[in-house]
Design a protein with these regions (language model features):
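Bacterial Sec-dependent N-terminal signal peptides
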Residues: 1-25, 448-450, 458-461, 477-479
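Intrinsic disorder/low-complexity segments enriched in polar/small residues
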Residues: 3-6, 14, 33, 252-257, ...
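Serine/proline-rich low-complexity intrinsically disordered segments, especially terminal tails, linkers
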Residues: 5, 19-20, 415, 428, ...
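Intrinsically disordered/low-complexity terminal segments and short unstructured peptides
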Residues: 16, 136-138, 152, 309, ...
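Extracellular beta-rich repeat passengers
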Residues: 23-62, 72-84, 91-92, 96-198, ...
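Primarily the HKD phosphodiesterase
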Residues: 68-70
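C-terminal outer-membrane/trafficking sorting elements
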Residues: 453-535
Length: 535
């Protein structure tokens, strides 16, 4: 398979104007300490989180689409939205907001900085109604004796969180994105967490709903739910690197009612539909994976997590129903697995329990549940799910995942978009991760633009192409701050011009997108050069 990758070289030429080039610019502003009044972060600057940055009520932090925010490594830079404060991170498909490592391309690693924490006033199942977020930040979450399940902590939309997640001690970690007691008035959609040093996403109680989530090459669990979380989740993807797993065991889903498995109310009962969880094993004979990989879903400690219309494949064990409380929830039908596919499970039948007298495999295969199980991941018929730099988890023609979904269950409320397919992606519609997700953040050079000297700031951006690497075509987008004659050319590594994609007069203030077909090129690295001459 040929693989073509772009590195973006931005050259901006305005006749009769003096320019400062800010490609790969250093940090423009350091954010630290407490934020007690409203702040606005502009995409014309790069920001650095230093230490634990607390946004306190009634402040709102608003982040412009396209903004790049680094987390400082030595100080464990972390953004914390405390109860009563808000974050408005409303990116776009063309201009996602990116929280990432400050380290150079090629030298980034899980745990390079802390992560993003949002604390709300919704219900949790801890006595007294409040608790402290793990990870050493001291953040309090939950609404106490007067919780508000409709609490609004703001918006995360088209946001990437890359190389976060610090494990201070076992069970005391900052995850990529922590949502503690967050209410359903909050908007969470189109969020990718990549290379998290601990869990990618973790919900500590609360009622917040979310759609379009990606966990990419995380270290520990992909989606962790506990302390009475009762939100609805739809359309999620997890892709695992076979070499990266946590010493304590890595799972796709991990869920607890609380830390000791009490029956405290409300019980942890997230309703999950249309997730695709891709484990480390491309087939059951594959042995070159980290031995700390465990289960596609580990339901334990009295949780009642329920999964519908989803795919879990490529794990040593597919599903573990752990403990008597989980067993009785399963047999009592408060814990449900319905209309889902499990495949490519290495050990035994892949569906298991530690409870004598309970046959988890028979329970899973109850005909009315509509579940299916396949020996090999390939039988699910996804196009290229184990491609680690450009995964394609879309069902191919005649895939069994193209049909079999059901939304007749009363738990699948109007929040859920009804589909006929199971898993995260439609076989017939455009992928929802296109244009904003990044499956190679290790090699991405973040560019904020070029600034004209003087008091007026003008921005000129060439965005990272998607997909990258690509075969045979990719999309290239750019933003202009001035009207002018604009050219976009492609060069090889020797500097020879390969192709002119654009040579036209264009207007400022628009995002332009071009498609580059590289089917006639050999594998290698190519450069996109964008120039403009002011008219």
């Amino acid at each position: 398979m040929r693989s073509i990758k772009f590195l973006l070289f931005v050259i901006f030429q305005i006749i009769y104007s003096s320019l400062v080039f800010a490609q790969l610019a250093p940090v423009d502003s350091v954010i630290e300490g407490n934020i007690n009044s409203n702040v606005y972060l502009s995409s014309t600057k790069k920001y650095l989180l230093r230490g634990f940055v607390n946004v306190n009520p009634p402040a709102t932090i608003t982040i412009e689409p396209g903004t790049i925010i680094y987390g400082e490594k030595d100080s464990k830079g972390t953004l914390i939205i405390n109860r009563g404060a808000k974050i408005i991170a409303n990116g776009t498909r063309q201009r996602p907001i990116v929280f990432t490592s400050q380290q150079p391309a090629g030298q980034r690693a899980p745990g390079d900085w802390g992560g993003v924490i949002i604390a709300g006033n919704a219900t949790i199942n801890v006595p007294g109604g409040t608790a402290t977020i793990e990870g050493g930040t001291g953040t309090i979450y939950g609404g106490g004796s007067n919780p508000n399940d409709n609490d609004n902590s703001g918006i995360l939309r088209y946001v990437r969180i890359e190389f976060p997640g610090i494990a201070f001690l076992p069970d005391n970690e900052i995850n990529g994105l922590i949502l503690g007691g967050v209410g359903r008035g909050t908007t969470i959609e189109y969020v990718q967490v990549s290379y998290s040093g601990d869990d990618s996403f973790e919900w500590f109680g609360g009622t917040v709903n979310a759609k379009y989530l990606i966990s990419y090459k995380g270290v520990d669990d992909d989606f962790d739910t506990d302390f009475g979380f009762r939100g609805n989740l739809q359309f999620g993807l997890a892709v695992r690197d076979p070499n990266i797993a946590d010493i304590g065991g890595s799972n796709g889903f991990e869920t607890d009612n609380d830390g000791t498995g009490t029956y405290n109310s409300p019980r942890t009962l997230p309703v999950i539909s249309n997730f695709t969880i891709i484990g480390p094993m491309r087939d059951t004979s594959f042995t070159q994976y980290n031995p700390n990989f465990r289960r596609g879903a580990h339901i334990r400690r009295a949780s009642q997590l329920s999964i519908y219309n989803s795919i879990v494949m490529g794990f040593p064990v597919g599903l573990l129903l752990d403990g008597s409380a989980v067993r009785y929830s399963a047999t009592g039908d408060t814990l449900q697995i319905r209309n889902s596919i499990w495949a490519g499970l290495r050990y035994g039948n892949g569906i298991t329990t530690n409870q004598q007298g309970f046959n988890a495999e028979e329970w899973f295969n109850t005909p009315s549940f509509g579940n299916r199980k396949y020996v090999q991941p390939s039988e699910v018929g996804l196009i290229d799910p184990f491609n680690l730099t450009n995964p394609n988890p879309v069902p191919a023609a005649n895939s069994p995942a193209a049909t079999g979904a059901s939304f007749s269950n009363p738990r699948l409320s109007s929040f859920f978009t009804q589909t006929t397919y199971v898993g995260a992606f439609s076989p017939n519609e455009p992928r929802w991760d296109e244009g904003w997700a990044n499956y190679d953040p290790q090699n991405t050079n973040y560019i904020t633009g070029v600034y004209e000297e003087g008091t007026t700031i003008k921005k000129f951006e060439l965005y990272q192409n998607y997909p990258n690497p690509f075969n045979p075509s990719t999309s290239i987008s750019f933003l202009l701050a001035e009207n002018g004659r604009t050219t976009l050319k492609i060069y090889n590594v020797l500097g020879a011009e390969i192709k002119t994609l654009l040579d036209s007069d264009l207007e400022a203030g628009k995002i332009y997108t071009l498609t580059f077909d590289g089917s006639d090129l050999s594998s290698g690295i190519y450069y996109a050069e964008l120039k403009q001459a002011q008219i």
